């Protein structure tokens, strides 16, 4: 199969009488309701459920092994290879399946807010609510947006099409397959809308570094003086919450590029976790869930259609998708200068990492490569309670290239622009998961504010004797004892045991990196 066939197949789908291209939000909402794909909530949002798959399915994600890219990809459990022949067979089946649908929905937009680096995308959906999701999450073209001569990356999404592992070369009925040569993503067997978003992110994580742009799984905001802050962390660690600040303008909540000019959002919307969401704790997100927004797997009252964000009947991984314009204080376009502060967020299930610490450059590289956090319930299938994990660059599931490519780029950027780096634990305090409690959000906000506003630049610090981290002794609005983990534990022997255990876990994990990273480990790793 060559690119001409692909182009003809796509054109045949787009030209079908039942294909709806670039429908407005109200028309998509009408289609969703008429097709019984979702219901309206009391605030006017659409609520849809996703069946068995309420999170990503990482074991079903593949990259096509192609001559132009196979020597660049970091093959393994994250980036599983699949043959060109298997892709071609599935592609033909998916196109045939989509042609037989009563209706198809197409969105044409972009990934990348900086026009110099943006990538055109075409999303073909079996579901109208998936198309609304794509319209709200990716960048919507406006009249002034110049057309791109670049060939679009196309998503063909067929949730009700199920693969046959024996004949199709997949691991299950579900598949998410990326072909870089054919600039096509096939998604089938799962109704979880997040697969579309993360597939495009994976593509950008392959393409942007080729242009000397660091692609990052982070949120970003900017202060009144133009000072930019980045927040790295996996799902549920607080990226979206902590970057939605009343005093700072949001650049984006999840995916960014860092070019020679500064930072830009890859997306045009937000995909916020909304388990236990409240107007009091997260007013910006709460308010954003209005007409045109999509609620995923959120429980509604049968009569009033009011959302119950505390009810996890479907999953703990409940989500809200909405365009970034729903947030009051945003930067438009979603572009800003170079970061002055970088925050690594982790949810430490053992409760032994300090709630905030200042990192040297070597420590920043070490913790970026380590990407320690806890998998939180429901962000992937099969995970029902927190468990310790290391996710390289705080985004390992989405990184096609070897880790050192991204780490070296980050180190270079820190050197060039003098960004200060902090490690913030939004996980547990006073004990590990099950005995301790989750960090107080107000305390975390106060610590982050002090870090990004430069209040910790000359603060008095002590050095943790296990992890070598530099811990501030005082931060306004935070009790002093909270800042030092050992002081929050009743059982000091248990604290020492857990802290040493975690330090050893860091060391064991770091063995997977080449000896070239030994200097980073010596200067940036635990002291024990």
Curated annotation (Swiss-Prot):
Binds 1 Mn(2+) ion per subunit. Its EC number is 4.1.1.49. Substrate binds at residues 56, 192, 198, 319. Pathway: Carbohydrate biosynthesis; gluconeogenesis. Mn(2+) binds at residues 198, 217, 254. One of its GO terms (molecular function) is metal ion binding. The keyword Lyase applies. The keyword Manganese applies. Transmembrane segments: none annotated. GO terms for biological process: gluconeogenesis. ATP binds at residues 198, 217, 233-241, 282, 319, 444. Its cofactor is Mn(2+). GO terms for cellular component: cytosol. It catalyses: oxaloacetate + ATP = phosphoenolpyruvate + ADP + CO2. Pfam families: PEPCK_ATP (PF01293). Its main location: cytoplasm. It comes from the Bacteria. Involved in the gluconeogenesis. Catalyzes the conversion of oxaloacetate (OAA) to phosphoenolpyruvate (PEP) through direct phosphoryl transfer between the nucleoside triphosphate and OAA. Belongs to the phosphoenolpyruvate carboxykinase (ATP) family. This is Phosphoenolpyruvate carboxykinase (ATP). The lineage of its organism: Bacteria, Bacillati, Bacillota, Bacilli, Bacillales.
């Amino acid at each position: 199969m060559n690119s001409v066939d692909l182009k003809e197949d796509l054109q045949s789908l787009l030209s079908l009488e039942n294909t709806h291209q670039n429908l407005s939000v109200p028309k998509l909402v009408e289609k969703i309701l008429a097709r019984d794909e979702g219901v309206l909530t009391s605030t006017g949002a659409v609520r849809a459920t996703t069946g068995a798959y309420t999170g990503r399915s990482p074991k079903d994600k593949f990259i096509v092994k192609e001559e132009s890219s196979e020597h660049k990809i970091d093959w393994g459990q994250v980036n599983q290879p699949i043959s060109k022949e298997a892709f071609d067979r599935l592609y033909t089946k998916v196109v045939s399946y989509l042609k037989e649908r009563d209706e198809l929905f197409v969105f044409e937009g972009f990934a990348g807010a900086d026009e110099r680096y943006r990538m055109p995308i075409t999303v073909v959906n079996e579901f109208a609510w998936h198309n609304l999701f794509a319209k709200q999450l990716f960048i919507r073209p406006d009249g002034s947006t110049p057309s791109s001569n670049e060939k679009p990356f196309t998503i063909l999404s067929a949730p009700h099409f199920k693969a046959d592992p024996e004949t199709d070369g997949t691991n299950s009925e579900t598949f998410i397959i990326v072909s870089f040569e054919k600039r096509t993503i096939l998604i089938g067997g799962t109704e979880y809308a997040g697969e579309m978003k993360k597939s495009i992110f994976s593509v950008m994580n392959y393409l942007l570094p080729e242009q000397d742009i660091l692609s990052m799984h982070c949120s970003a905001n900017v202060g009144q003086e133009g000072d930019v802050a980045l927040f790295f962390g996996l799902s549920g660690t607080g990226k979206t919450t902590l970057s939605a600040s009343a005093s700072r303008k949001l650049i984006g909540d999840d995916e960014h590029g860092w070019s020679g000019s500064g930072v830009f959002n890859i997306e045009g919307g937000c995909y916020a976790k909304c388990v236990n969401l409240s107007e009091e704790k997260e007013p910006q997100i709460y308010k954003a869930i209005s007409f045109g927004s999509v609620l995923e797997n959120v429980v509604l009252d049968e009569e009033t259609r009011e959302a119950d964000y505390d009810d996890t009947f479907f999953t703990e991984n409940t989500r809200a998708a909405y365009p970034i314009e729903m947030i009051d204080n945003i930067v438009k376009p979603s572009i800003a200068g170079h970061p002055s502060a970088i925050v690594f967020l982790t949810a430490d299930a053992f409760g032994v990492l300090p709630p905030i610490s200042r990192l040297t450059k070597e420590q920043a590289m070490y913790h970026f490569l380590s990407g320690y956090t806890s998998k939180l319930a429901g962000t992937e299938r099969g995970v029902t309670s927190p468990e310790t994990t290391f996710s390289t660059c705080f985004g390992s599931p989405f990184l096609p290239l070897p880790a050192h490519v991204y780490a070296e780029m980050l180190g270079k950027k820190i050197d060039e622009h003098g960004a200060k780096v902090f490690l913030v634990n939004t996980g547990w305090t006073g004990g590990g998961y099950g005995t301790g409690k989750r960090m107080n959000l107000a305390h975390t906000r106060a610590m982050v504010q002090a870090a990004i506003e430069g209040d910790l630049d000359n603060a008095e610090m002590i050095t943790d004797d296990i992890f070598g981290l530099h811990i501030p002794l005082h931060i306004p609005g935070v009790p002093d004892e909270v800042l030092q983990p050992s002081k929050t534990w009743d059982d000091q022997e248990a604290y020492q045991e857990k802290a040493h255990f975690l330090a050893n876990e860091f060391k064991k994990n770091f063995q997977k990196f080449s000896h070239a990273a030994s200097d980073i480990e010596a200067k940036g790793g635990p002291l024990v």
